[in-house]
């Protein structure tokens, strides 16, 4: 038995025994029997190297282990920090085709290695961990990398715990804190994570649309938290937040603010309003702290009035709440209104009697919480600056030309006008120097464009009514201009990009990403589809992609309603029914006939026919996206493209189907036989009698199927999450600088910056992460453009 000590120089065998502790090196304790060779043998810088010397059996076992690991897939042995959400493909292998997996005995021990045996079994204080990491020093690059890595790891672990808790809430495995209240108002607490459902249980959003507005607000709150995390203002804190969509319900998970559950005589909300504007706080310290936030988000200081008519100045919306926790930190909560209203859409589509609604068959939009995206505000602000600079340059050129003409005229008439006093055309300063007249002087360039997040809200309307103002303020006008810019410039420009294939999204996710990058909300999908001609062959495919995105989102909302009206154990049958009614009508015209007796007892399922589903989809698309689907859209657009739509719907809902060939028409027996033989890996080779019997049984089973998707094909429901992820700002800056250098032709500098960004991403996020994969892909393209195809293939392999 050897006893090993770890020191700054490495590891060495000490002189301890089973009954006596002696940290002295074993080679020195032997005295005269020791030699330089023994000293080298009993110590090493690496623990692995020392163990290999001491135990030949360990050395052989380690060599065998490394040999076995070299034969595995890279993703099975690569270390990873963690990710916000595990990859959940929409098609997975069933139990009969599942690939054997090796159990990693080291993974359950990781928490003990990080936290110790005692802390691993205790409740984690998620909020204190997050705020402590945020307060870590970041004065140099190494400190920033360590801080970013710890933040990413915390967010990943918090998201993992929040997903497990949210699934327990939906499955009814967690008791609520207020069991006597209605189900929509239930709150939950487990492992120091607070859970609530995405309903308007407290009637906060009654005037904005009720549950529909509350559902939107939860997602916008994540966007607001993400904005503040990117700004990373010292002294301003946010909560860890995750929104989880699972089995038709939305659950919000948040870390707990210190002291939030304690009753205090004085209110903790010191900034903003907690009672819909009855009282509005404006703490001076909070106001100063929010000044850099307002500057970064282009918010101006604006006035709001409470119910008593008292006027206060705020930077953020009154719905954003500033709170001082018992730990002395300042927190911002309810960040769903961190951008202004889309006032043009609100006035034209969200109010009955408006011309845009009255002149069409479209219903009134289902909620009034229609906000602009932060990307659009940035684009509009930059566009406004560009226009102002151009106008200033034109005016400056005109002034210069005018002064030159005036100077020439003065030169010609210098003799005759020499006796005249120049006081009429020039002023003299204190030093006696002549300068142009104040009437002709062009002022220095100044630009100011601020938005009010409370523009066109009831609180601002109350203030205007008090002061008797009828016209819009400058900040209100800026909000209206941004809304018009979205409708009249951004949306048509994006439609032209799609029509000309300047932007070529290949999936619904890529389309959504492209729209969000341009600041376009999903409610404008219908407007984009209307701008794309349906009779042009080259545009037909991209228009179908836009329409399928609307259809899949409409089906998601329909399924959400069905799940809430159906027992949990019938969700698989309910989903299979919807999928068959949507993409399986060419094989079975009445899928509801094949429901189980228990499912037929649910009225919503028994009455669901393909025609009824198509009408409901058309109604949802018209309501949510302001687009009128053709009455025969299933026959004209879905037929022949069922697999594409099936994939989009499954990804939107969060479901995993069995990996097999789905026949949307009744297949022939020969086709089924060939597919099964090919899937089993036999090809044209000889099969045994047992194998032939198995193939025949499988063929008969497929031929007897009446539906495209059976309820047994629904293997799993996965949780879809929205996480307020923290990105590494320095790594992102290096990445963008590298891309810009490559576009400018500076290949060497660009490649160096990209490799530096790649190293930072690997240190922060690990190898197995989407951000790291993005860097690998861009570096691969840079090498490919330079003709270095082997390096390009190597980096692209790592990206994939």
Language-model-detected regions and their locations in the chain:
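Extended, well-ordered protein cores
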Residues: 140, 144-295, 302-305
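Conserved metal-phosphate-binding beta-hairpin within the catalytic cores
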Residues: 316-341
